Curated annotation (Swiss-Prot):
<dbReference type="Pfam" id="PF01386">
    <property type="entry name" value="Ribosomal_L25p"/>
</dbReference>
<dbReference type="InterPro" id="IPR020056">
    <property type="entry name" value="Rbsml_bL25/Gln-tRNA_synth_N"/>
</dbReference>
<comment type="similarity">
    <text>Belongs to the bacterial ribosomal protein bL25 family.</text>
</comment>
<dbReference type="GO" id="GO:0006412">
    <property type="term" value="P:translation"/>
</dbReference>
<dbReference type="GO" id="GO:0008097">
    <property type="term" value="F:5S rRNA binding"/>
</dbReference>
<dbReference type="InterPro" id="IPR020055">
    <property type="entry name" value="Ribosomal_bL25_short"/>
</dbReference>
<comment type="subunit">
    <text>Part of the 50S ribosomal subunit; part of the 5S rRNA/L5/L18/L25 subcomplex. Contacts the 5S rRNA. Binds to the 5S rRNA independently of L5 and L18.</text>
</comment>
<dbReference type="GO" id="GO:0003735">
    <property type="term" value="F:structural constituent of ribosome"/>
</dbReference>
<dbReference type="InterPro" id="IPR020930">
    <property type="entry name" value="Ribosomal_uL5_bac-type"/>
</dbReference>
<keyword id="KW-0689">Ribosomal protein</keyword>
<protein>
    <recommendedName>
        <fullName>Large ribosomal subunit protein bL25</fullName>
    </recommendedName>
</protein>
<comment type="function">
    <text>This is one of the proteins that binds to the 5S RNA in the ribosome where it forms part of the central protuberance.</text>
</comment>
<dbReference type="InterPro" id="IPR011035">
    <property type="entry name" value="Ribosomal_bL25/Gln-tRNA_synth"/>
</dbReference>
<keyword id="KW-0699">rRNA-binding</keyword>
<dbReference type="GO" id="GO:0022625">
    <property type="term" value="C:cytosolic large ribosomal subunit"/>
</dbReference>
<keyword id="KW-0694">RNA-binding</keyword>
<keyword id="KW-0687">Ribonucleoprotein</keyword>
Amino acid sequence: MSFKFEAEVRSAQGKGASRRLRHNGQVPAIIYGGKAEAVSIILDHDKVNNAQAHDAFYNEVLTIVVAGKEEQVKVQAIQRHPTKPKLVHLDFKRI
């Protein structure tokens, strides 16, 4: 099973901006590693939440399309809300 997500570059940083994203059904994330700079991105919460229900999401290489460029990544860390079934933040590491 392969996973491919469309992402936007996130320009607004900080707690308030992240809360606004989550309120709008999006989740903040970051892609880092390799020789390229780290990129803060925005993903659709429901698509990622549905995908993470599969074990393959954690073990396989994922494809994230950011500004027309495909990034091959693996999940490095996921932060979840303590009482709600919501994702708070994701970290991806480039392959």
